[in-house]
């Protein structure tokens, strides 16, 4: 063989897109003939798709790059598989050739002999190929169904030229003789004519003998050159051996040849069928003519290619689509986000620039899923646009992504030892010849990694940032996904699409579609509760669905587990830390929602330590309304940077007042768990305690709203219970101030708890004689008195008074305060003489020490007047209460709680003297102001309501009294935790 694979000129490998002709053979004999026709033999492909099972021979004929494949076995199915795989791997193929051997069907019009050539050509009956085993049996006959496509116009016009060539047969013979000129190539040359026997219909060869009297006598040809016939070729999976069937095909279908592969190709592979005749489609089968028949068919194909100008095969640019995940068939919602992304990404948006868009949002919110869906939609809408995906999780994955781009485009030089792959990829994509492309940079969170210059190992010691390798082309677009809003603005300017948690309806749909048993136990109310608990976060919902599927439970069952776990941080963390499989995430990713933010925590700790410190504190206080002043002081610039970092990761949200923040509930839980696993939670909770204690004020009438705003954070941080030694002073101060808040707002039971805790800690740390300890003893005794535990109050107050005398002296304001409080206890127990004596003594000492208009002095005046009233000395009581009220209005203001107490007490004196109209007016004023200042459910407000109702009854206004008492009872029911001191005893009139 003179022009075989062994002797043809060899060339290096070419890229798959450089091949324009596909050549398919059915058997090795046909492959040998095809290879003999190659002008040049090419090297094999550098790589081949894993789903392509073909084995290719590559070369060129007449300037065309040709790819040849041989089927593993006969049949239309194998031909179809081979053709599909070939077209996927070699995307620039313009047409194909099915070249090999077949069975000829001679007729009166077509004197077909062995060694002749049959070429598929459309006719009135068909497009050049029919499928003889595709049809229906009708009325004892057979009706073919279906229609196969014909050859492409380019080949038909070339065939027309060949048919006009008078010397075609001679040229074919010369090519065969030249290709198989070696001495051992005899079987490839023209066989003996006596082996060409055609039997009459119905008298085919039976066994190994021939029936000579039934042989068709044909005129001997003068030349051995093959003759070419054109018409329909019949193809199917069944072998034709019947003369009757052969005659039917010739007469009814115009068939000139039968074979077993072409029907599998015609409807999707633009090809022409060329067959060398090796038998007559009857029982007379032997292999003597197969080599020659294969050779002449291959020679015809070569001549055909040589008359088609290579320039007519204009190559089209190959389009690549390389993403790590399949399309999500259950993609839900996010249409507005996708619209924004797709609108901004198309080059038509601004043709003079490379479009850049960033998708940003909290980890687990679905950014990668949106980018993936965008990739598939762009492929569908713009099939000429290549799509590439790069994971920016680390430098290695970034480099691997650029290497894959180079491999896909067969960029020269990538296999060199010191190849700068990223520069090669950038240079290639930045050229207009690269065509349209979309580059997706996923997880572009680390600004340092992307924008900080690092020394490259390219031999020249240069330093470049990874971002400098991003290509620029007016035909290109880059889509980033990032958890970091700052990174998003770095990468895409104002073209940022912010993704938040799903709307509830989409969350419910995601939950339901993620379940295996979708209808089982799907109670919508429970489902709504669950997605709200999970903050409508897609990753958390997928995790919950995976747990439900794995354990074959219902949503209601999972909800019970979640809500019971929510009573304990650790139990909830364990539930939300259970791993699950997610085909739409990287294998290296942490799938559980509790783990997904760990990389972000580390990034923040590295890039902005102050932001990390803010996060630690926010993780230890209440989730909502975190005041800016709670955060450790820093310069304005540093504070803005730190807050900006946390908002950039969507961990916190700045509220409209710009002075407070909310932290995402699950992020807060994850941050606490992260601190715990690192052994830092104990110290960080102490830091948070210090900050809360620093800002939580000692209660005053003026700062009531501040205390209300800060109380949830104080309560939350105290749930940690154990704190470092350096936080103990802050703990004592905070307990004291919370107790004071509760006391001043009438929540005496709560006040007792916090006063008692503060007292116990102060005893341990400071000792019983320390002023702070004594102060806490006094506070606790006062609370006992307020909710009627007079014996305990008297005992503790006596201890307090003795200690104060020892430590401060008898004239000290704190000692006088204790004397006042003990007098109140005497009064409440009906010991008016002792109360009056002690209160008079206190009042005189306060006047001397503090002055007549000091609030403490006024308090003693009020208390003494009350004792007079309790003993029926109304004139003295009224005079002293009037004096007290006027001084309080001047010094404290008309709406101060102490002023309101004096108003109430003066009205009580009026009532006891029978001056009901004056009492009613003053009670009404007091009640109105107490509602405004203290709130409707404060014990003092309820006391005013009770007093006014009594005055109504005393005046016969029973309807007004009944209505007011119902209001009082409803307010008391709403706040059962409060226990006010009993209403003052009312002295009966004599």
Swiss-Prot record:
Keywords from UniProt, A to Z, are:
Hydrolase, Repeat, TPR repeat
Q: Fetch the InterPro entries from UniProt.
A: NB-ARC (IPR002182), NLR-like (IPR053137), Nucleoside_phosphorylase_sf (IPR035994), P-loop_NTPase (IPR027417), TPR-like_helical_dom_sf (IPR011990), TPR_rpt (IPR019734)
Q: Which Gene3D superfamilies match?
A: Nucleoside phosphorylase domain (3.40.50.1580), P-loop containing nucleotide triphosphate hydrolases (3.40.50.300), Tetratricopeptide repeat domain (1.25.40.10)
- The superkingdom listed in its UniProt entry is Eukaryota
TPR repeat ranges, renumbered to this chain? 732-765, 774-807, 816-849, 858-891, 900-933, 942-975
Protein's GO biological process: nucleoside metabolic process
**Can you give the residue ranges of the NB-ARC domain?**
334-563
Annotated stretches, region: Purine nucleoside phosphorylase domain: 22-304
**Catalysed transformations (reactions):** ATP + H2O = D-ribose 5-triphosphate + adenine; dATP + H2O = 2-deoxyribose 5-triphosphate + adenine
Give the E.C. number(s): 3.5.99.-
Biased-composition ranges for Basic residues?
981-990
Q: Where is this region: Disordered?
A: 965-990
Q: What class of enzyme is it?
A: hydrolase
Q: Which GO terms describe its molecular function?
A: ADP binding; hydrolase activity
Q: What does this protein do?
A: The N-terminal purine nucleoside phosphorylase (PNP) domain cleaves the N-glycosidic bond of ATP, and to a lesser extent dATP; has very weak activity on adenosine and deoxyadenosine and no activity on (d)ADP or (d)AMP.
Description of its domains: Has an N-terminal purine nucleoside phosphorylase (PNP) domain, a central NB-ARC domain and several C-terminal TRP repeats. Expression of the PNP domain (residues 2-308) in E.coli slows growth considerably; the PNP domain has ATP nucleosidase activity.
Question: Which PANTHER family does this chain map to?
Answer: AAA+ ATPASE DOMAIN-CONTAINING PROTEIN-RELATED, ATP/GTP-BINDING PROTEIN-RELATED
Spell out the protein name for this chain: Nucleotide-binding leucine-rich repeat (NLR)-like protein
């Amino acid at each position: 063989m003179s022009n075989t694979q062994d002797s043809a000129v060899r060339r290096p490998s070419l890229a798959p897109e450089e091949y324009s002709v596909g050549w398919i053979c059915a058997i090795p004999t046909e492959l040998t003939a095809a290879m003999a026709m190659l002008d040049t033999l090419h090297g094999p492909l550098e790589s081949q798709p894993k789903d392509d099972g073909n084995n290719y021979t590559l070369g060129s004929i007449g300037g065309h790059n040709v790819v040849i494949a041989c089927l593993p076995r006969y049949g239309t199915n194998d031909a179809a598989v081979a053709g599909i795989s070939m077209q996927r791997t070699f995307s620039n193929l313009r047409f194909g050739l099915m070249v090999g051997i077949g069975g000829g069907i001679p007729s009166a019009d077509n004197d077909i002999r062995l060694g002749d050539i049959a070429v598929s050509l459309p006719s009135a009956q068909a497009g050049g190929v029919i499928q003889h085993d595709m049809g229906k049996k009708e009325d004892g006959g057979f009706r073919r169904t279906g229609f196969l496509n014909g050859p492409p116009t380019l080949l038909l016009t070339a065939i027309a030229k060949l048919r006009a060539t008078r010397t075609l047969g001679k040229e074919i013979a010369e090519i065969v003789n030249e290709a198989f000129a070696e001495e051992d190539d005899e079987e490839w040359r023209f066989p003996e004519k006596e082996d060409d026997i055609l039997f009459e219909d119905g008298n085919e060869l039976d066994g190994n003998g021939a029936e000579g009297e039934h042989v068709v006598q044909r005129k001997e040809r003068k030349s051995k050159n093959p003759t070419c016939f054109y018409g329909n070729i019949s193809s199917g999976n069944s072998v034709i051996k019947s003369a009757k069937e052969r005659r039917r095909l010739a007469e009814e279908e115009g068939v000139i040849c039968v074979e077993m592969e072409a029907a599998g190709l015609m409807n999707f592979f633009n090809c022409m069928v060329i067959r060398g005749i090796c038998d007559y489609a009857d029982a007379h089968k032997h292999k003597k003519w197969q080599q020659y028949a294969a050779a002449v068919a291959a020679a015809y194909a070569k001549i055909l290619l040589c008359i088609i100008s290579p320039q007519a095969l204009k190559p089209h640019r190959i389009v690549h689509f390389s993403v790590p995940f399949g399309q999500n068939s259950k993609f839900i919602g996010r249409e507005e986000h996708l619209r924004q992304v797709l609108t901004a990404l198309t080059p038509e948006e601004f043709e003079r620039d490379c479009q850049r868009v960033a998708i940003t949002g909290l980890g687990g919110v679905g950014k990668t899923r949106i980018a993936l869906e965008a990739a598939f939609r762009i492929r569908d809408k713009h099939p000429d646009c290549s799509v590439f995906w790069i994971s920016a999780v680390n430098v290695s994955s970034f480099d691997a992504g650029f290497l894959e781009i180079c491999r896909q485009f067969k960029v020269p030089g990538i296999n060199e030892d010191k190849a700068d792959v990223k520069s090669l990829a950038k240079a290639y994509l930045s050229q207009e010849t690269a065509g349209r492309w979309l580059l997706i940079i996923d997880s572009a969170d680390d600004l340092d990694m992307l924008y900080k210059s690092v020394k490259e190992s390219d031999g020249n010691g240069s330093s470049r940032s990874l971002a400098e390798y991003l290509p620029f082309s007016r035909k290109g677009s880059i889509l980033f996904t990032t958890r970091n809003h700052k990174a998003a603005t770095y990468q895409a300017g104002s073209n940022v699409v912010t993704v938040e948690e799903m709307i509830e309806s989409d969350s419910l749909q995601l939950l339901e579609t993620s379940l295996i048993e979708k209808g089982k136990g799907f109670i919508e109310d429970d489902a709504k509760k669950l997605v709200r608990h999970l903050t409508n976060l897609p990753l958390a919902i997928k995790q919950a669905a995976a747990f439900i599927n794995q354990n074959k439970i219902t949503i209601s069952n999972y909800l019970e587990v979640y809500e019971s776990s929510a009573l304990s941080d650790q139990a909830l963390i364990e539930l939300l830390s259970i791993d699950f499989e997610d085909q739409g995430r990287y294998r290296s990713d942490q799938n559980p929602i509790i783990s997904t933010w760990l990389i972000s925590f580390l990034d923040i700790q590295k890039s902005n330590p102050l932001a990390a410190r803010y996060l630690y504190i926010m993780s230890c206080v209440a989730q909502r309304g975190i005041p800016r002043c709670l955060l450790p002081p820093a310069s304005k610039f540093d504070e803005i940077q730190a807050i900006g970092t946390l908002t950039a990761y969507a961990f916190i949200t700045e509220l409209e007042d710009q002075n407070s923040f909310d932290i995402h509930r699950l992020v807060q839980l994850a941050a606490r768990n992260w601190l715990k696993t690192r052994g830092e939670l104990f110290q960080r909770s102490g830091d948070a305690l210090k900050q809360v204690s620093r800002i939580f004020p000692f209660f005053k009438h003026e700062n009531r709203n501040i205390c209300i705003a800060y109380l949830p954070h104080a309560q939350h941080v105290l749930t940690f219970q154990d704190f470092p030694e350096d936080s103990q002073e802050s703990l004592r101060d905070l307990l004291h101030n919370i107790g004071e808040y509760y006391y001043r707002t009438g929540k005496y039971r709560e006040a007792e708890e916090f006063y008692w805790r503060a007292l116990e800690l102060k005893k341990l740390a400071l000792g019983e004689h320390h002023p702070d300890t004594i102060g806490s003893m006094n506070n606790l005794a006062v609370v006992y008195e307020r909710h009627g535990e007079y014996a305990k109050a008297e005992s503790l107050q006596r201890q307090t008074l003795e200690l104060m005398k020892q430590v401060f002296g008898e004239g000290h304001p704190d000692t006088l305060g204790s004397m006042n409080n003990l007098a109140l206890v005497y009064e409440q127990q009906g010991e008016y003489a002792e109360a009056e004596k002690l209160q008079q003594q206190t009042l005189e000492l306060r006047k001397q020490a503090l002055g007549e208009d000091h609030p403490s002095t006024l308090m003693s005046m009020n208390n003494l007047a009350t004792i007079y009233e309790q003993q029926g000395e109304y004139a003295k009581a009224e005079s002293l209460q009037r004096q007290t009220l006027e001084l309080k209005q001047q010094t404290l203001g008309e709406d101060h709680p102490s002023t309101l107490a004096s108003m109430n007490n003066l009205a009580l004196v009026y009532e006891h003297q029978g001056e009901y109209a004056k009492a009613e007016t003053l009670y009404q004023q007091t009640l109105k102001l107490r509602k405004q200042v203290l709130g409707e459910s404060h014990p003092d407000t309820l006391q005013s309501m009770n007093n006014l109702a009594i005055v109504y009854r005393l005046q016969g206004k029973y309807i007004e009294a009944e209505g007011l008492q119902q209001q009082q009872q409803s307010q008391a029911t709403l706040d059962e935790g409060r226990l006010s001191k009993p209403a003052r005893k009312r002295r009966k009139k004599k």
